[in-house]
Amino acid sequence: MREDFCVFILTHGRPDKVMTYKELRRSGYTGRIYLVVDDEDKTAQRYIDQYGDEVLRFCKADIQASMDDGDNFPHRRSVIYARNACWDLARQVGARYFIQLDDDYSSFLYRYDKDHRYASIRIRSTMDALLSSLCRYHETSPVLTVAIAQGGDFIGGDQGANRMRRKAMNSFVCSVDRPFQFVGRMNDDVNTYVSLGHRGELFFTVMAAMLTQAPTQASAGGLTELYLDYGTYVKSFYTVMYAPSCTEIGVMGDKHYRIHHKINWHNAVPVILDEKHRKGRP
């Protein structure tokens, strides 16, 4: 794996359940991994006992003072502080590129086979190659970040999947040369790709690969308590506040419905017209 790259696993309150670490190694990743733990985590010492120098700590209050929570709640329960700390942490460990991952991934998969046919193939030895290719894409294009797809991106199977989507959620390949800030205590990934995408910044999801994540609220720790306290109703309205011209509230689900945001992409981001539509010049 390239030496200027590292993986940051953002984790809180569950040192015995960092599934992502084990899955990365099982998938063939040979590079550096760091667990990003905040200074308010009561289980921080247990992380250090298990992972030693692979644990990086940051001050939540310092990060909060430099960003927009999107609310006035009197607490700091959110992953957003860890997300925004990663650029400083990357410089600290001498990395130019990094990927932010949550701590509860059970698998990484390729969604197309070698003949470019729609498939589902578990990654067992080529994780270095996947992450290196995402870094090269970041290097050679003007994107702010690139994400690995999630299961919901493939609803509709081969009829619904496409090779690129103009959003980024959950995993983020970033560079210290192109820093940006996540905004909003909840729904921070959506708030960020919509509010910055609105200004022409590029966020992409690569559909060639997918990560599998535990269902929200299934495991204690992380953001579970925040979601249980406020629910998806409050969560979705953060994005309405940041981008009211292109966000509305709806419901999703089959039998058990829940409130969720809906993005109108026609209003959300600038689009590039084909050159054939350009007006002639005198």
Would you name each region that the model predicts?
Residues 97-102, 144-149, 203-207, 248-251:
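A structural signal for short, well-ordered beta-strand segments and their strand-loop junctions
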Residues 18-21, 44-48, 109-112, 156-162, ...:
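A short acidic (Asp/Glu
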Residues 106-195:
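Conserved catalytic core of nucleotide-sugar-dependent glycosyltransferases
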Residues 9-28, 40-48:
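Short, well-formed alpha-helical segments that are part of the catalytic scaffolds
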Residues 2-5, 15-16, 184, 190-282:
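C-terminal catalytic/acceptor-binding lobe
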Residues 38-99, 106-119:
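Active-site-proximal specificity loops/subdomain of glycosyltransferases
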Residues 8-10, 36, 101, 206:
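Short hydrophobic segments within beta-strands
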Residues 3-9, 24, 31-35:
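Hydrophobic targeting segments
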